[in-house]
Amino acid sequence: MTTEPKDPVADLAPEPAVPSLVDRYFTRWYKADVKGKPCEDHCILQHSNRICVITLAGSHPVLQSGKTIKSISYQISTNCSRLQNKVSGKFKRGAQFLTELAPLCKIYCSDGEEYTISSCVRGRLMEVNENILHKPSILQEKPSTEGYIAVVLPKFEESKSITEGLLTQKEYEEVVVKRLRATTAAS
């Protein structure tokens, strides 16, 4: 019984990576420094049917180590709560209309920091993730899947133009690298 000699080059070749469910069905778009606040980056997952899922980008301060989320609130003002959004029918009647800068929720951390998460996309609010109200930790554990913030449906006419002010994955990675270089050069 002879054994074939092992090919050392084959051991070094990486296995073809299977794309995640999110990467397979969604295109990632990013909005860096939302409302001029440094590092407060948002990620918009756009499906081919134009639905957009609003999540936190990996560099957002809430997702950094050491942060603990105390609570999350969809109560934007005394008269406006995203939880009151009731959508019905084929034409999504009753959905709240959002602009790019419309606040979706507020995240309160145990260190006293407060972060307002914005829509980044014009459209109708389809749903908010009520699961993060009861278990805020999933926002940090699974930000692109179970820890999403909200689902927004852009107007059909605007569905192609919503990505104009957003960054691609590669452009966003370049922004993060520049940010890291700037902080290491300053220290």
Curated annotation (Swiss-Prot):
Biological processes, Gene Ontology terms: dendrite morphogenesis; regulation of actin filament polymerization; regulation of filopodium assembly
Q: Which InterPro entries match?
A: Abitram (IPR039169), GCV_H/Fam206 (IPR033753), Single_hybrid_motif (IPR011053)
| Keyword list, A-Z | Actin-binding, Cell projection, Nucleus
Signal among keywords: no
The name under which this protein is listed is Protein Abitram
The terms under GO molecular function for this entry are: actin filament binding; actin monomer binding
> What is the native source organism of this protein?
Bos taurus (Bovine)
Q: Which Pfam families match?
A: GCV_H
What PANTHER family does the entry give? PROTEIN ABITRAM
Q: Hey, which family's this protein in?
A: Belongs to the ABITRAM family.
| Compartments where located | Nucleus speckle; Cell projection, Lamellipodium; Nucleus; Cell projection, Growth cone
Q: What does this protein do?
A: Actin-binding protein that regulates actin polymerization, filopodia dynamics and increases the branching of proximal dendrites of developing neurons. May play a role in transcription regulation.
Top-rank taxon of the source lineage equals: Eukaryota
